From Swiss-Prot:
Residues 1951-1968 have a biased composition (Polar residues). This is Major antigen. Keywords: Coiled coil. PANTHER family: CENTROSOMAL PROTEIN 2 (PTHR23159), CENTROSOME-ASSOCIATED PROTEIN CEP250 ISOFORM X1 (PTHR23159:SF31). Residues 74-120, 151-251, 327-384, 417-1879 form a coiled coil.
Length: 2022
């Protein structure tokens, strides 16, 4: 309050407060912004690209290809998946931004811990302003700071700056830690983004491929559709042509027919056909009808003309008929042909239509198939997923399935599953085939034995040959190893030298890099600082605007809340008012107008609320728009910052990677080629020992599994390669962007240099303008905030005032009406009282006259009346006391009225202020909107530029991606072709393996059956042994040749497999390196390209192998032909064997002997097997030798590492040399710079002196002219502005004084209200006492005794009481005085009510005037605001002009003094010149510093340009290498095509060979069948031999018997010599026997010959068999030994493989080390080249500089000649200048240090200082807010008090009404009491005054009329006995109810007491007593004596009852009666 009284605050204080509030708002806005940025949703730029691509794809598919909806849905799903991934990226970005914001908050908290000064005093405001101006503005304002205070303030600021520097150092440490954390988070974020981008790019690529395939399909379908459409169009055209031709023919036919018909009609004389047709029926004539009728007529004419026509006519008709018949037949035939053709054409059309329908159905089917294929893809993916889950159940838990699966993933999974299922199927097929082969082998074992034997012999021979060949190769390998060792030694020596040079080069390169990095960091730091400053400015502006908007919104929300509260209050008030009006409407219809007014006001309020709501909605919408713009701006800034940082990091990484990769690739290619050659040779030497088929089988099985793994890995590698290529493309794009940014930065640097040079000149002007602008902005902000505050306050006051006025107007109307009614009632009551008084006096006189005898009773009665009168006089005295209080209240009321008038005036003024402020707010809003629109336009332009650039970059990126995709597709196709070739080769290998397995199984089965067949084939082998030996030699030679050919193929395959293993290992490492480093990608790509070259070599080797295999096949064909001839021979031999089987019977014994011989041969074969085992034992040391060779290779690798170390030492030496060279260069550059600086100093000194003099003279003249003009205009404007300002100040002072008066008035109102409450209490007590006194006066009469006194004594006493002026006279009671006092009170009340109504009317008028004045005030306020703005501008211009005037005056003074001193003393002039020279030198020093900075920047730019040139060279090399690789790829494609052709030829040849082999197998089967037949024949022959042996035994027996018979015969001859007959018979018989014996002997001879022949043949066969068995045993032994050797070799092979794996691992590690070393070497070489180039450039620069120095020397000489002349003049000055220069140097140093410190503080700690100031401003804002809250609280208190006052006023009004009611009730009650008392007295006096009851009734009526003026609550008498002379108030107690005062006032309503419950009209006890008295009077008097008070009184105006006067006087009494009735 005191501050408000003091008047307006000073300008400085206002500006300081405004800056503080603004800064607090900045901080609040910043906090809000920090809070708001938590919900940032970063939309990655890839969302728009993916969506755009998806949309374009959808449009193409819909328009061109009519793509199905299912595919579009799938595409949309993919795009949604991509957008979801991008949203995940955006969420990650938002999370990181939140973390950054948390770090910022931590910074704020840490900085909040700094010391903040409490700004409690007024001096702090000035200090704050100085701080802000010192920090923010480069100069100090001349108004506020004097020259004396300036150094003190500088010292204070320096101290504060030192304190802040100490605090900032602590904060820097924390900032560094936080920055490290931020960098770590950024790196993690970058890794995550790269992974996501890689995944996204793979998906995009797969998606594009799928789209391409689908587009290709759709194009094919489209081409088919076009073709079908063309065919349909052609068919249609053909049909149309045919139809037209037929139609023409048909028309011709019809015409012909019609002509014939016409001829017939004419001849017959009948009517025409057409007339018949038209006459017969009204049918239309058509061609069909003509034909039909013509045919009918033909028939009819033929039928009708027959009997009539004559013979001549018959002949003619016959001729005509014949002709007509021919024509008719032709016509019918043509018609039928035309019909057929039409039918055919229709059929064709139908066919074409059917074709179209079929094509459409095919299209639908294709679409359905597409949908089914997509569903099938999904099902396949589910099946594959289920398969993978089933496959992985044992190993791991199933991974969660994806919601949406792209086709590439389905294809991959299906491939994987198909490969796995194919592998499983292959395994099962192998098993089945093995089973089938076993079954077939069991049947065909005999056929394969001979071939296996021959092969084994050939292999054994070839193995021996290979052993010798390998021994030779081992010797060669030893020689090569020795050569390699020598080379390694030399390489180690070179390595040592190279290492030393490399170390030296690395050190030098490190130094150069540090220098380059430092320069780059400086440039980047500067650029980042500039960007940060711009961003900070933008953020500050946005924060300011957002803070302003938030404040607006908060104010609007508060206003809305207030409006809601006021609306609720208004609603409650309206409800109360409506209730009151409802009650009033029942009585008075005139109050309807008031209700209508209230309704109108309510509608106006509702409209205003709606308008405010609309305003609030508009403000919220504006705020939302601004918030969205701010969010978008923040997102753009954050995205730009991130992109800048990422681009910088990527640029550094790319530069490094390119430098490394470009060098490493060239070296690695050469080295890898050499190493691959060396490795291939070494591996060939090692792998030539592995020449056996079983090992090949195992290896091939393993290779198949590995190939499947490799395929999977190749698929993964393809994806990885694609991702890497995508990354490379992104890196290229980033490189391009980085180059563009570098160019932009270079341009920016040039521009900045120019701007710096321009800004140095324009700095002073800019500083002054900035000061003016800052002052304007501050003033505008101060005024804006002040206006806002005033507006809010005024709006609140206005609302409260409006509400109060409305309430008061309503109440005034009510009170006016009530007063009018009360006046009418009072007038009527006064008339009635007067009449009653007259009647009463008349009746008293009559009673006095009638009762002279009753003198004593009258005395007693008079004594009673005397006492009563005394009592009433005391009460009147008390009423007179309250008159003073009432007068005081009236005076207070007058004061209040005056205050109300003042408040109304203040309200009017406030309304004016609010209107003016609203106008100002509208202007400010417009300005802000214009600024916001400008900012929006700028942001839109920036965004459009950014989008355009981004679209261009995206297009370039897309083009590059497409080119890369094309290259990738080509490479994939090539890889697929290579894989197919590999698969074919693998299939071939698998087929050969299967055949080998088959043959092996057959050999095993045959080995089992050989033992069984040995005995049977002995004879066969004897014959075939010679041929077998011959064949063995041939087969051995062929087998050796084959083994020789197979060994290199085997070695090459192993080398390929090892190469594949190496590839796998290298690719695995590449994958691991790719995750962390992108640099190794290109190296791995080149490595893969080298491996592709190796693959090409392998393919060439395979071609050579194919050639060898072809030669082998030719040899095998020749061998097969020879074998066929041999088989033919064997067949002939077998035929001869069939003939010789008979001889086998006799050859058993010889066979047994031969078996023994064969056993011996078996022993020999066992011995041969042992020899072979010894040979294998000899091979084992060769394997040991191979192991030793591996160890030697390991040693060689170690030697290579040592050589690498030597090379590093050489590199160190070279680096040292480079360091020395760089030191020399630096020294030379220092000398050169010194020379340049000296030359430039001299030049600048000369030019500066000239320019300075000219410039200063021009500036002085221009400044003088400007100052004069400005001074004139400023004075004119100042005068006008001062006048307007003074008027404004007077108005402001008036407003402030009014506000102070209003506040004082409120205080006085509060005090008066308290006083009024106290007075009300006093009045209440007084009324209570009055009632008690009246009750006492009434009750005294009961206890008076003295009826016997005379009337004379009574009169005397009466006279004495009236005359005595003593204290006794106070005890008198005069009713007339009381009536007069009451009437005065009533008149006073009426006057007050009238005044109140007048005041209300005045308030209404004032309100109307205030509403009208608002418009005027608004207009005036706008005028005032314009005037104030003009005044502010004028003041600012005045200040600037004053500054200029001051500076100009100073300059003029200095010039005047200089002129005077020049005139007076030359020395004075020299001193001034010296000062100018010192200033010039200082500026020259600054210019030198700037020039040095420019030079450094130029150097940095030159270095950057050199680096860019190097990068361009690297890129050109890379492109050349790329073209070279593309050419190589083309060559590879041609070679792969040749390989494919060769493979196809080879397959055809293989198929032909397989057919030949099958033929041979069939032939062998035939031979085997023949052998089986031979075996059967042999068995049969054996059986025949056995039978022959049995016959021979029988014959021998018969011979023995015959010999016995002969002996018996001889005995019988001796005995029976006498019997001649018997002898003759015996002789005959003997002759017969002899003949038979001869025959038998001849047969035996034949048999012997045959047997001998067979024996010989059998012997031969047995010999062959024994040889074969021996060979077989030998072969079996060999096989066993070979199996043992194979098993041993397998074990050895496993060991060797383990060693090889270890060696490969070691080799890989060594290769990685070698690669690293090679990379380092390549880097060093490139760096060395760069250093050499730089050194050459430096030498060139040095030469150019030397030339320049020479030129400068010449110029220097000329300048020296010029300066020599000036030196003579300057020698005298130099002595004085040296001291001044020293001082100036020190001052310059100090100033530079201060400037640097200030700049550092501003750059590094500006934000923190701003935060500190913001904190201080927050404190000020808190203080201001506290003041505001206090003010608001005070206003609320005032409002509450006003409300309470209004409520009290209402209560007082209610109390007045209640008092009236109470007066009426008291009158009524007093009347009843008086009636009761008088009735009692009358009953007592009936004895004496039986004839005079009217006097007592008259007296009772007078008392009743007197009592009707008073209304009081119920009273109870404490005791029945008391002293009448003592007024004991304690015994008469007023009992209040338990309700609060808010619910009733002064006893309104029913009240509960301790003794009785009474109504407002009177107590029930009195009613009871009154009724008792009435009943007594009626009983004693006979009826109506006591009821005369209710009788009518005759008067002049008519008759009127007292009960009506008591009951119908007031509205409140009617309400009370209604309550009683209810």
């Amino acid at each position: 309050m005191e501050k408000a009284r003091e008047g307006a605050p000073s300008k400085e204080r206002r500006s300081a407060e405004e800056t503080i509030s603004r800064e607090t708002r900045h901080e609040i806005a910043g906090n809000d912004g920090d809070i708001g940025t938590d919900n940032i949703e970063y939309i990655d730029s890839m969302d728009s690209t993916g969506l755009g691509y998806g949309r374009t794809g959808e449009g193409i598919s819909r328009i061109l290809y009519e793509h199905p909806r299912d595919e579009l849905i799938n595409y949309k799903r993919r795009i949604d998946a991509n957008t979801e991934q991008q949203r995940e990226h955006a969420d990650i970005m938002a999370a990181l931004q939140r973390k950054i914001e948390e770090y910022r908050r931590r910074f704020a908290e840490i900085e909040g811990r700094l010391v903040v000064h409490d700004l409690n005093e007024s001096g702090d405001l000035v200090n704050m302003k100085l701080k802000e101006e010192w920090l923010l503005s480069p100069k100090i304002k001349m108004e506020e700071i004097s020259d004396v205070d300036f150094p003190n303030q500088l010292e204070d600021e320096r101290r504060r700056a030192e304190d802040l520097a100490i605090q900032l150092q602590q904060e820097r440490l924390q900032n560094d830690q936080l920055q490290s954390e931020i960098q770590r988070l950024r790196q993690q974020f970058g890794i995550c983004i790269r992974d996501k981008e890689r995944i996204y790019q793979t998906r995009e690529r797969n998606f594009t491929r799928f789209l391409g395939e689908e587009q290709r399909k759709m194009m094919e379908l489209w081409s088919e559709l076009q073709r079908v459409r063309k065919q349909c169009a052609e068919y249609r055209e053909q049909t149309e042509r045919d139809l037209e031709n037929q139609r023409n023919e048909f028309i011709k036919v019809i015409r012909h027919v019609s002509g014939i018909v016409r001829g017939l009609n004419i001849e017959n004389g009948t009517h025409t056909l057409l007339s018949d047709l038209s006459s017969e029926s009204g049918v239309e004539i058509t061609q069909d009808t003509v034909l039909i009728e013509a045919v009918k007529r033909f028939h009819e004419s033929q039928q009708q003309t027959a009997p009539v026509i004559g013979p001549e006519l018959i002949t003619e008709l016959r001729l005509a008929r014949a002709e007509d018949a021919g024509l008719h037949d032709e016509l019918m035939r043509k018609y039928e042909e035309s019909a057929k053709r039409i039918i055919e054409l229709e059929a064709r059309d139908d066919e074409s239509h059917n074709k179209l329908v079929a094509l459409e159905s095919d299209l639908k089917r294709t679409r359905d198939r597409l949908a089914e294929s997509q569903n099938a893809l999904r099902k396949l993916y589910d099946m594959t997923y289920s398969y993978e889950i089933n496959a992985e159940k044992e190993t791991r838990s199933p991974s969660p399935t994806k919601g949406y699966v792209p086709p590439p993933e389905v294809v991959r999974s299906v491939r994987y599953v198909l490969n796995s299922r194919a592998n499983d199927n292959n395994v099962l097929q192998r098993k089945l085939k093995n089973a089938e082969v076993q079954i077939s082998e069991l049947t065909t074992k005999n056929d394969s034995l001979e071939e296996i034997r021959r092969r084994l012999e050939k292999r054994i021979a070839e193995a021996n040959r290979t052993i010798t060949h390998r021994q030779r190769e081992l010797d060669d390998a030893k020689h090569t190893v020795k050569d390699l060792e020598d080379r390694l030694k030399s390489l180690e020596q070179e390595k040592a030298s190279i290492d030393s040079a490399r170390h030296h080069l690395e050190d030098e390169i490190r130094k150069m890099r540090e220098q380059f990095n430092s320069t780059l960091l400086d440039v980047e730091r500067r650029a980042a600082e500039d960007a940060d400053e711009r961003i900070r400015k933008i953020d500050e502006e946005t924060k300011i605007r957002i803070s302003e908007l938030t404040n607006r919104i908060e104010m609007l929300l508060e206003e809305n809340k207030r409006l809601k509260d006021e609306n609720d209050g208004m609603k409650n008030r309206i409800q109360d008012i409506e209730k009151e009006y409802n009650t009033i409407i029942r009585k008075l219809e005139e109050k309807d107008n008031a209700l209508k007014n209230l309704e109108n006001t309510r509608q106006r309020l509702v409209n205003e609320l709606e308008e405010q709501r609309t305003r609030f909605d508009t403000m919220t919408s504006e705020f939302d728009n601004l918030r969205t713009n701010y969010d978008s701006a923040n997102k753009n800034t954050v995205a730009i910052e991130l992109t800048v940082k990422q681009i910088k990091e990527q640029r550094d990484e790319i530069i490094k990677q390119k430098d490394k990769l470009a060098k490493e690739l060239a070296d690695l290619e050469n080295k890898l080629n050499n190493e691959t050659k060396m490795r291939g040779d070494a591996e060939k030497l090692n792998q030539r020992h592995l020449d056996e088929i079983d090992n090949f089988k195992k290896q091939i099985n393993e290779y198949i599994t590995e190939v499947t793994i490799i395929r999977r890995q190749n698929d993964d590698f393809d994806t990885q390669m694609k991702t890497n290529q995508a990354k490379l493309s992104s890196m290229k794009n980033s490189l391009i962007a980085a180059k563009k940014e570098i160019e932009k930065l270079s341009e920016m640097n040039n521009r900045l240099q120019q701007d710096k040079n321009d800004l140095i000149g324009a700095k002073q002007k800019g500083d002054t303008e900035l000061n003016l602008l800052t002052e304007k902005i501050r003033k505008v902000e101060i005024e804006f905030e002040r206006i806002k505050k005033d507006n809010q306050e005024l709006e609140d006051h206005e609302r409260t005032a409006r509400d109060d006025l409305k309430q008061e107007t309503n109440r005034n109307h009510l009170l006016a009406k009530e007063l009018e009614e009360a006046r009418a009632d009072i007038v009527a009551l006064n008339d009635r009282l007067a009449k009653m008084d007259a009647n009463f006096k008349i009746k008293l006189d009559e009673t006095i006259k009638k009762s002279p005898a009753d003198h004593e009773t009258i005395k007693s009665r008079e004594s009673k009346s005397e006492k009563i009168i005394v009592k009433h006089e005391t009460k009147i005295y008390e009423i007179n006391k309250y008159r003073a209080e009432l007068e005081k209240l009236e005076s207070d009321k007058d004061d209040l009225e005056k205050r109300i008038i003042g408040l109304q005036d203040e309200l009017n003024e406030k309304d004016r202020d609010t209107d003016r402020l609203n106008a100002e707010i509208d202007d400010l809003k417009r300005k802000l909107q214009t600024e916001i629109e400008k900012v929006r336009k700028e942001t839109t332009t920036v965004q459009e530029r950014y989008h355009i650039e981004w679209d261009e970059e995206r297009d370039n990126h897309q083009k590059k991606i497409d080119s890369m995709n094309a290259l990738i597709d080509e490479l994939r196709s090539k890889l697929n072709d290579a894989e197919r070739a590999m698969a074919d080769l693998q299939n071939r290998d698998s087929i050969l393996e299967r055949e080998n397995n088959d043959w092996k199984e057959k050999s095993d089965a045959l080995n089992m059956e050989l033992d069984r067949l040995r005995d049977e084939l002995l004879s066969v082998r004897r014959d075939a042994e010679k041929e077998i030996n011959r064949y063995n030699t041939d087969l051995q030679t062929a087998a050796r040749n084959e083994i020789k050919l197979l060994t290199p193929t085997n070695n090459e395959m192993k080398s390929q497999l090892n190469a594949a293993e190496d590839k796998i290992n290298s690719l695995n490492k590449v994958i691991t390196d790719q995750q962390n480093k992108i640099r190794d990608l290109t190296g791995e790509v080149h490595h893969l390209e080298g491996e592709l070259k190796d693959a090409k070599g392998n393919v060439a080797n395979l071609e050579s192998e194919l050639d060898t295999t072809r030669e082998r096949i030719h040899l095998l064909g020749e061998q097969n032909a020879s074998l066929q001839t041999e088989l033919n021979k064997i067949k002939g031999d077998i035929d001869s064997l069939f003939g010789e089987n008979d001889m086998l019977k006799t050859a058993k014994e010889s066979n047994e002997a031969e078996i023994d011989r064969l056993k011996q041969k078996l022993q020999r074969s066992i011995e041969n097997a042992k020899k072979y085992s010894d040979a294998l034992d000899k091979l084992r040391p060769e394997y040991d030798r191979l192991q030793n060779l591996y160890r030697e290779k390991i040693k060689q690798a170690e030697n290579l590492t040592q050589a690498v170390q030597d090379l590093e030492s050489r590199l160190n030496q070279s680096r040292r040399e480079l360091r020395d060279a760089t030191d020399k260069l630096i020294a030379s550059e220092g000398d050169r710079n010194a020379l340049r600086s000296e030359v430039e100093k001299l030049q600048h000194e000369v030019q500066f002196m000239r320019e300075q003099l000219l410039r200063k003279t021009d500036e002085y003249q221009a400044a003088l002219s400007d100052l004069v003009n400005a001074h004139r205009t400023a004075e004119d404007g100042r005068v006008n502005a001062v006048q307007a300002l003074e008027a404004r100040k007077y108005e402001i002072n008036d407003l402030q004084s009014r506000l102070d008066n209003a506040e004082q008035y409120l205080v006085t109102l509060q005090q008066n209200y308290v006083a009024v409450e106290n007075e009300r209490d006093m009045l209440y007590d007084a009324l209570r006492r009055l009632h008690s006194m009246i009750d006492r006066t009434v009750t005294i009469n009961r206890f008076l005794i003295g009826v016997d006194e005379s009337m004379d004594e009574k009169k005397e006493t009466v006279l004495q009481t009236q005359k005595s002026p003593d204290g006794k006279s106070k005890e008198r009671f005069d009713i007339s005085d009381l009536d007069t006092n009451i009437q005065k009170l009533i008149g006073r009340i009426e006057k007050l009510e009238l005044e109140r109504n007048e005041y209300r009317d005045a308030l209404d008028r004032i309100k109307k005037k205030s509403i009208e004045s608002h418009i005027k005030i608004n207009k005036q306020e706008t005028i005032f605001t314009n005037i104030e703005d003009q005044l502010v501008d004028v003041e600012e211009e005045k200040r600037t002009l004053e500054m200029r005037l001051a500076s100009a005056k100073q300059l003029l003074r200095s010039q005047e003094e200089a002129l005077k001193q020049r005139d007076e003393e030359r020395s004075h002039m020299k001193l001034k010149i010296a000062k100018f020279e010192m200033e010039a030198r200082g500026k020259e020093a600054q210019l030198r510093q700037l020039n040095e900075l420019v030079r450094n920047l130029r150097k940095d730019l030159e270095t950057a340009q050199g680096d860019l040139g190097v990068l361009h060279d690297h890129e050109e090399r890379w492109y050349a290498h790329k073209f070279h690789l593309e050419s190589k790829l083309k060559d590879q494609e041609s070679e792969s095509q040749q390989i494919r052709l060769l493979v196809a030829n080879f397959e055809t040849e293989r198929n032909s060979l397989n057919e030949k082999v099958r033929d041979l197998a069939s032939r062998l089967q035939q031979t085997e069948s023949k052998n089986a037949d031979m075996k059967e024949d042999n068995d049969r022959l054996k059986k025949d031999l056995i039978k022959a042996s049995t016959n021979e035994a029988e014959l021998r027996r018969t011979i023995d018997q015959n010999s016995r018979v002969v002996s018996d015969n001889q005995i019988l001859k001796d005995q029976l010599e006498s019997a001649q007959n018997d002898l003759s018979n015996a002789n005959n018989r003997k002759q017969q026997l002899e003949n038979e014996l001869l025959v038998v002997r001849s047969e035996l001879r034949d048999l012997k010959q045959r047997f001998s022949d067979n024996a010989n043949r059998i012997i031969d066969l047995q010999r062959h068999l024994t040889d074969a068995e021996n060979d077989k045993k030998r072969l079996t032994n060999r096989l066993n030994s070979l199996e043992k050797t194979v098993s041993q070799q397998r074990t050895i092979e496993t060991e060797i493989r383990q060693q090889l794996s270890l060696a490969l691992n070691e080799r890989n590690t060594l290769q990685n080390d070698l690669r690293d070393l090679q990379r380092r070497l390549a880097r060093m070489e490139t760096e060395k080249k760069i250093m050499n180039d730089k050194y050459d450039e430096l030498e060139k620069i040095r030469a150019s500089l030397i030339k320049r120095i020479e030129l400068l020397d010449e110029e220097k000489r000329t300048m020296e000649n010029i300066l020599h002349e000036t030196a003579l003049q300057r020698e005298a000055i130099e002595s004085s200048l040296n001291a001044l220069e020293r001082e100036n140097k020190e001052l310059h140093r100090n100033c530079a240090q201060l400037q640097q410190q200030i700049a550092q503080l501003e750059l590094e700690n500006g934000n923190r200082l701003i935060q500190l100031t913001n904190k201080q401003r927050e404190e000020y804002d808190k203080f201001a807010q506290n003041m505001r809250t206090e003010k608001i609280q005070i206003e609320r208190i005032i409002e509450n008090r006003e409300r309470s006052l209004k409520s009290r006023i209402n209560q007082l009004e209610n109390q007045l009404n209640i008092m009236r009611d109470q007066l009426n009730s008291e009158r009524r009650r007093r009347r009843e009491i008086s009636d009761k008392i008088l009735s009692g007295e009358v009953n007592k006096l009936n004895v004496t005054l039986s004839g005079i009851p009217d006097a007592y009734e008259m007296y009772d009526r007078t008392l009743y009329t007197y009592n009707t003026y008073f209304g009081s609550p119920s009273f109870t008498v404490g005791s029945s006995s008391f002293d009448p002379n003592i007024t004991d108030d304690s015994k008469i107690i007023l009992k209040h109810s338990d309700r609060l005062e808010s619910s009733y006032a002064y006893g309104g309503g029913n009240r509960t007491s301790d003794t009785a419950v009474t109504a407002p009209t009177g107590s029930s006890s009195y009613h009871g007593q009154r009724s008792d008295t009435h009943t007594v009077n009626e009983s004693e008097r006979g009826g109506n004596d006591s009821g005369k008070g209710t009788k009518q009184v005759d008067g002049e105006g008519g008759s009127l009852s007292l009960s009506e006067i008591g009951q119908g006087a007031t509205f409140e009494q009617q309400q009370q009666r209604r309550r009683k009735r209810q």
